[in-house]
Amino acid sequence: MFRTVPKTTLLAPIQRRTLLNGNYPKAYPEHVPLTCLGRAVLAVGSGFGTFFDSRRGDLVATLGEATAQPYFIYKLREQMLKDPTGRRLLREQPRMTSKSLDLDKLRNMKVGSIGRTYVEWLDKEGVSPDTRAQVRYIDDPECAYVMQRYRESHDFYHALTGLPIIMEGELALKAFEWANTGLPMSGLGMVLTPLKFKPKQRKRYFDVYLPWALYNGFRSKPVINVYWEEVLEKDAEELRRDLGIEQPPDLRQMKKDMAKKK
Amino acid sequence: MLRSTTLQRLRPAVFRVQRWNSTTTSAPKPSTTHSDIVVVGGGPAGLTIAAALKHYPETVNKSVTLVEFGSLDNLKTWGPDMERFENRVSSLTPSSVEYLTKIGVWEHVNRDRVQAYRHMTAWDGVSGSKVQFNTTQLMGEGRDIAYMTENFNLQNGLLKQLANKPNLTILDKTKVEGVERTPESHNKPLVKLSNGSTISTDLLIGADGANSPVRTFSGIEARGWDYNTHGLVATVRLANEQQSAWQRFLPTGPIALLPLPNRFGSLVWSTTPKMAAQLKQLTPEQFVMMVNCAFNLEPTDIEYLVEHPDEIMTDAPYRLSQRSSNPDVPCPIVAVQDKSRASFPLKMKHADTYIAENVALVGDAAHTTHPLAGQGLNMGQGDAQSLAIAIRNAAGRGADIGSTLTLEPYWADQYFKNHKLLGVVDKLHKLYSTRNPLVVGLRSLGLDAVNSVKPVKDFLMSQAS
């Protein structure tokens, strides 16, 4: 008798509506409507996951979405609404992929340009613009785009600052992003992850990178409003100047220097 | 709602008074006549008190002189077609209308140009939480929340009612140049007019607007503050017929759309003086788009578009299309009436007292308020009613109509009632002019609670009407 009950009928009600799954209609195709409790569970779960394994990009992304709503993602959209370029981004909603960016063309751009710096950085770190996850848990479709744009721009922030994707670099960039965008996930990462650092790492982080990140993040213009696709030819140093960002010390070089001193 | 003319009217009057006082002490006395009651100001409050005094048998034989600085000719012959509506419109509450009916004025008001409404929606522009009032649910069938009436329509009706009344003199285009009390006049006010005559009176009623010369002459202080906000009014055309009032609280100030007959609407947009000036300079198309944005988009969006008028016609339609149709938002505005955009500064002001020996203040002369509750004119109507009854009671007893003992009931009736209303409106304005997320959260919680608890709503409705 038990065998005759198909598995799907047992699972079906859970998919339709539970404590965690909201029953409101999808605002965009990839949307997963959640209840408040659902969002909280997601935040706690992905938070723990991220803390113990910060290489899990999917968990970091989920944590970002679960904590951005309500309020924070709307504040970020407000920053875009205050700026002509930000408004144009919201209207045109461009997406960044390895196709739309034409990486080969970027490799042939002049040294020091945003496009070249970005692609060199991608090649050096061995990542691709296609590794960015789709936004699912943000309810407002326009805010979902803001989140998506923030995520896709992340690699450009690396290119802009020259911070590597080792833990300290990633964290310094998180701190910069928190100061600049106000998204709580970046703030959580900035505060909690250093607990796992070795003393030397921690000293470097607190003495050099954190002050750099916070100072520049607060001071510079909102980097979410950069139309990266249009500034690829621009000199990175010039863009940094336009935005009001100083370049941080090269982290890998500094590591080597510190190792030599020993 | 507010009369902008009072401002220009004022300063020269005060200036001349001093000059007159200093020169007339030795000069021969000009011709002096007596009028039992002198009403200064031909606005709704002044005309209503005159009409009320001429209604009661106890006061109908008292001689009344009404002095108005401006010309009343246009008001007497006023009667535009149904394709034009004035931009100064007030929301008359049922109790104001009840009294106007009682004293025979309401029948002279052109009722085709009055729009009753039974629904009202107010919502928070930052959080979106809202409160809805609906009289058919709250107060039984057949009750209206209020009646949208052009101020000119009301004044025209009042003047019709006052036409050919005995013992009533209306002096328009006449300025009050000074008020003096001398031992010969038994310390009663001597009102010196710009036409050279002087009137001695038992009771001087100041219905002369926010910068009331009568109040100044009487040495009554009015205290309050500037909201540093301007009220922009305009007559707009709506996409379809409406019987609802709408108000959205933006951090820069509330924007309200009130229904008028024939698909017209009255707009009151309270905002920063700078933004009000920018809005007045927009082309009609841009302005219409901007008003629709103001009811739909985020405050940041609205502020950006006002700052960048070039982008209104290109960017705003896209922004509006991103908002899914929201049933809480009024129907689109399709046009703005030519030359109907005007703005004036908003102030909270309350006179220390409404009465002195032989003097009473009513309407804006006694108090000014923010238009967000639509109560400014109604407060003046309440004053006129209460003061007229106090005078009637004294006249019936044969008592001195100018003594503070006679006027005291008026003050007792109205002062604290008005003070409470001024305070509530002032706090509402302050509560909604912040974007602090904590305050926004709390006020939204409060508004949602009000919206879901019926007795609270009933109480608020009864207070408003």
UniProtKB/Swiss-Prot annotation, chain A:
Membrane disposition = Peripheral membrane protein
Q: Where is the composition biased (Basic and acidic residues)?
A: 252-262
A single GO CC term for this protein reads: extrinsic component of mitochondrial inner membrane
Q: Which cofactor does it need?
A: Zn(2+)
Q: Where is this region: Disordered?
A: 243-262
EC number(s) per UniProt?
4.1.1.130
Q: Which UniProt keywords apply?
A: Lyase, Membrane, Metal-binding, Mitochondrion, Mitochondrion inner membrane, Ubiquinone biosynthesis, Zinc
* Amino-acid positions noted as binding Zn(2+) in the UniProt annotation, renumbered to this chain: H154, D155, H158, E170
InterPro entries per the record?
A: Coq4 (IPR007715), Coq4_euk (IPR027540)
The pathway that the record names for this protein is: Cofactor biosynthesis; ubiquinone biosynthesis
Reactions this protein catalyses: a 4-hydroxy-3-methoxy-5-(all-trans-polyprenyl)benzoate + H(+) = a 2-methoxy-6-(all-trans-polyprenyl)phenol + CO2
Domain of life of the source: Eukaryota
A GO biological process of this protein is: ubiquinone biosynthetic process
The subcellular localization recorded is: Mitochondrion inner membrane
How it assembles, according to the record, is: Component of a multi-subunit COQ enzyme complex, composed of at least COQ3, COQ4, COQ5, COQ6, COQ7 and COQ9.
Q: What else is known?
A: This protein may be expected to contain an N-terminal transit peptide but none has been predicted.
Q: Which family does it belong to?
A: Belongs to the COQ4 family.
Q: Briefly, what is this protein's role?
A: Lyase that catalyzes the C1-decarboxylation of 4-hydroxy-3-methoxy-5-(all-trans-polyprenyl)benzoic acid into 2-methoxy-6-(all-trans-polyprenyl)phenol during ubiquinone biosynthesis.
- Please give the name of this protein: Ubiquinone biosynthesis protein COQ4, mitochondrial
Q: To which species is this protein native?
A: Yarrowia lipolytica (strain CLIB 122 / E 150)
